[in-house]
């Protein structure tokens, strides 16, 4: 029995890729290992968006040098965006790596692992570059393999990512994604619908639709029939079992009135919109080649507020210290953040990425210390706005999908919830996911199988129930109350004391305090209060 250890750095796309690779390898008889020592196959899923993410991967590879020397039979593979961009560099810097596989070739991983194990040597599978052939050939080389979902790899069984789009054609000057993920393509709507049904059958109550510019989603069938995001949301809305539908990350120019009206009219669709602005200066936006002006972004915000009203929650991304950014241009960003009053923002210092249009053409001339100061200043402005915004929730009752124990209880069940991972943008998330051998599931040969897991749907639901039962017994033995965490429909984090029996349910929570960017609450329904009282008396 082969054992796999997988480490993931990067965005939700990478987390989803890892989930699918694990599912594929489990079908080959693999189990998950908790650490590299107990694994015979080690995969690093990588990100190239920021230098910090690449440094994490090379740091991990450095630690694996000794492991490989002492255990040459172990297979080490690098997958994801770094693999697509730097395959030969990876082999030069870490010659003990056995395989390098780009994000569009993940279906080849099982075969390449076996080939490396039998034949030895180094093996590569990457997609065509953006200028390496005809457009259709390039697109086909970046297509992801059929979804095989592995719910035990998710932070919890109740929330799942669903890819609806791959690639990007925006070519922002700072961004490497169009090179590593390939041309923008919308998946067939029927494939998306079928996968959403699978996720609902597995117990997912909330799905998050993923795309580099997800609201640009477009699929044109052979009859020239167009399907856009608004059409897709309408269709997914009718799936039984799903309670919430979110989507990230959005592009400002494609936040159309039609899409906003669809969000308004479909109660399952979250009014949380992550729409990166990146800069409040037209001059900087032009250098970034973002494709819109500050005025157009303001118009978009006006459409959102007019259509969704107070229900809307908009978050954003910002890059400070981009090439040539002056004090005045940075101040324009500060002023616009104060004007737009985002729910939250993710703020990052610019770092030049080799292979992007900015590298070598635009000087990275803002000193690091200036970048750091601007990062801290803008973060302080945004945090003040977020805290003021959260004050408006005091005394209100909000519906919360309860994800699991908060970080205070994370040591015991540290794979149930990760607050940060579910809010950061596709471009900027750093996250490590490590498999848990206790959750490995054998493939079933029964007839009524879920296409996602290869297991009977009822059997999987029993697996989830068993996992919850074990967690409940652990807390009940300790006699402790548990601080739980969850999210509102508009993606605000809420923590409160309650019974673990509430995990996976959507409950009304009364908000009585705030702590930083977190809402503090208490259960308010008779049933939920009863569960809390039962927990206290046990």
How should these model regions be labeled?
Residues 7, 210-212, 248-250, 276-278, ...:
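Generic beta-strand/beta-sheet core signal
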Residues 1-218, 228, 258, 263, ...:
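Proteins enriched for Cys/Gly/acidic motifs involved in redox and nucleic-acid/cofactor modification
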Residues 76-80, 85, 201-332, 338, ...:
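Conserved SAM/AdoMet-binding glycine-rich loop
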Residues 87, 211-222, 255-256, 277-288, ...:
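Flexible glycine/acidic-rich beta-alpha junction loops that bind and position SAM and/or redox cofactors
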Residues 358-538:
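Terminal RNA-binding accessory module
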Residues 154-158, 168-170, 269, 279, ...:
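Short flexible coil/turn linkers enriched for glycine and charged/polar residues
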Residues 275, 317, 337, 345, ...:
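Hydrophobic, well-ordered secondary-structure elements that form the walls
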Residues 271-273, 285-286, 297, 306-313, ...:
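Extended hydrophobic-aromatic, low-complexity segments
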């Amino acid at each position: 029995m082969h054992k796999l250890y997988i480490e993931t750095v990067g965005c939700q796309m990478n987390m989803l890729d890892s989930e699918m690779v694990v599912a594929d390898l489990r079908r080959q008889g693999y189990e998950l290992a908790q650490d590299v020592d107990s694994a015979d196959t080690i995969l690093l899923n990588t990100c190239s968006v920021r230098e910090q993410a690449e440094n994490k991967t090379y740091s991990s590879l450095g630690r694996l040098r000794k492991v490989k020397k002492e255990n040459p039979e172990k297979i080490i593979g690098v997958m994801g965006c770094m693999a697509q961009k730097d395959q030969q560099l990876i082999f030069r810097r870490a010659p003990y790596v056995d395989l390098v596989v780009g994000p569009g070739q993940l279906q080849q991983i099982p075969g390449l692992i076996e080939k490396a194990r039998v034949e030895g040597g180094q093996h590569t599978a990457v997609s065509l570059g953006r200028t390496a052939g005809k457009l259709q050939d390039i697109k086909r080389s970046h297509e992801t393999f059929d979804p095989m979902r592995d719910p035990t790899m998710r932070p919890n069984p109740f929330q799942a990512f669903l890819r609806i789009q791959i690639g990007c054609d925006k070519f922002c000057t700072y961004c490497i994604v169009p090179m590593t993920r390939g041309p923008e393509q919308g998946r067939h709507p029927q494939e998306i619908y079928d996968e959403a049904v699978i996720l609902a059958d597995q117990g997912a109550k909330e799905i998050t639709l993923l795309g580099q510019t997800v609201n640009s989603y477009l699929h044109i069938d052979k009859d020239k029939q167009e399907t856009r995001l608004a059409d897709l949301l309408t269709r997914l809305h009718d799936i039984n079992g799903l309670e919430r539908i979110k989507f990230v990350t959005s592009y400002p120019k494609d936040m159309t009135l039609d899409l906003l009206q669809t969000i308004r009219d479909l109660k399952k669709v979250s009014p949380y919109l992550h729409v990166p602005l990146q800069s409040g200066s037209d001059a900087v936006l032009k250098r970034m080649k973002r494709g819109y002006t500050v005025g157009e972004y303001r118009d978009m915000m006006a459409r959102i507020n007019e259509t969704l009203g107070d229900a809307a929650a908009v978050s954003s991304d910002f890059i400070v210290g981009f090439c040539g950014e002056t004090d005045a241009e940075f101040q324009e960003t500060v002023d616009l953040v104060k004007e737009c009053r985002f729910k939250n923002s993710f703020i990052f210092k610019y770092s030049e990425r080799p292979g992007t249009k900015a590298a070598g053409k635009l000087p990275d001339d803002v000193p690091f210390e200036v970048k750091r100061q601007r990062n801290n200043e803008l973060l302080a402005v945004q945090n003040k706005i977020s805290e003021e915004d959260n004050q408006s929730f005091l005394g209100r009752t909000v519906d919360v999908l309860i994800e699991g124990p908060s970080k205070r209880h994370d040591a015991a069940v540290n794979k149930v919830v990760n607050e940060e991972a579910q809010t950061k943008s596709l471009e900027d998330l750093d996250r490590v996911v490590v498999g848990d051998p206790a959750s490995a599931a054998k493939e079933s040969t029964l007839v009524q199988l879920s296409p996602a897991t290869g297991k009977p749907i009822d059997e999987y639901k029993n697996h989830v129930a068993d996992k919850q039962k074990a967690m409940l017994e652990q807390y009940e033995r300790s006699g402790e109350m548990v601080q739980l965490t969850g999210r509102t429909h508009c993606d605000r984090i809420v923590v409160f004391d309650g019974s673990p029996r509430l995990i996976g349910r959507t409950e009304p929570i009364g908000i009585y305090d705030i702590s930083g960017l977190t809402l503090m609450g208490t259960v308010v329904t008779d049933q939920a209060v009863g569960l809390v009282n039962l927990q206290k008396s046990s």
